[in-house]
């Protein structure tokens, strides 16, 4: 085994190229996240003190270490990374990591898991761009399962990977073909449904068909694959 391969196997390499995703921590959640984002094209770095049990491809690299360690993050080239996903099991470690990461890269998109929903404001204040509390989501689904099972089934269906559907977030820029059109107009586009709009007035689920799309809106689109 040549030296470069030894370093890659044990997680010793210093990353020099730009990175699409850094995943911090390895558990069931980070494994599910990895499976969803890995298209064998995006560059992905996994930082964990436990080596992931996955089939590594050329676009994926493992670094053995503490995700809140500044040196480890620098070796993972966090300064040139686009997104970092914090999936560690300990909320305190995640909060510390957010501070360090934001100091190293003010522009990186930090996506954080929080086990305790009460810590979400702290994570946002520390510099996380998006924060998710999986336990709160799971608890909500379990609480309504007995009385509204098909609501839960619909939610699980829409949030699961499907070969027939894609969910896209589309920012409406100046000059976009969507500007000035209503959602009713958009239905004329085959296999496209707008299921949410983020506007200057906030987020609206299942907006009215007469809503007129404006510059600055973000459209949540469900598109069916065309066969």
Positions of PLM-derived features:
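Cytosolic regulatory regions of ion transport systems
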Residues: 1-227
């Amino acid at each position: 085994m040549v030296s470069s391969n030894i370093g890659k196997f044990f997680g010793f390499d210093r990353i020099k190229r730009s990175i699409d995703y850094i995943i911090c921590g390895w558990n069931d959640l980070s494994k599910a996240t990895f499976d969803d984002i890995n298209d064998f094209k995006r560059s992905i770095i996994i930082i964990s003190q436990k080596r992931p049990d996955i089939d590594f491809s050329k676009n994926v690299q493992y670094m053995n270490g503490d995700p809140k360690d500044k040196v480890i993050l620098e070796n993972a080239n966090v300064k040139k990374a686009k997104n970092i996903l914090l999936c560690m099991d300990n909320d305190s470690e995640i909060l510390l990591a957010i501070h360090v990461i934001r100091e190293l890269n003010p522009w990186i998109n930090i996506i954080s898991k929080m086990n305790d929903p009460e810590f979400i404001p702290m994570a946002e204040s520390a510099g996380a761009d998006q924060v998710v509390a999986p336990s709160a989501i799971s608890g909500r689904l379990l609480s309504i399962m007995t009385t509204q099972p098909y609501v839960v089934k619909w939610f699980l269906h829409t949030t699961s990977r499907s070969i027939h559907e894609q969910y896209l977030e589309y920012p409406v820029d100046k000059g976009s073909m969507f500007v000035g059109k209503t959602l009713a107009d958009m239905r004329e586009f085959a296999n496209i449904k707008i299921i949410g709009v983020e506007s200057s007035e906030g987020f609206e689920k299942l907006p009215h068909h007469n809503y007129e799309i404006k510059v600055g809106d973000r459209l949540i689109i469900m598109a069916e694959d065309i066969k």
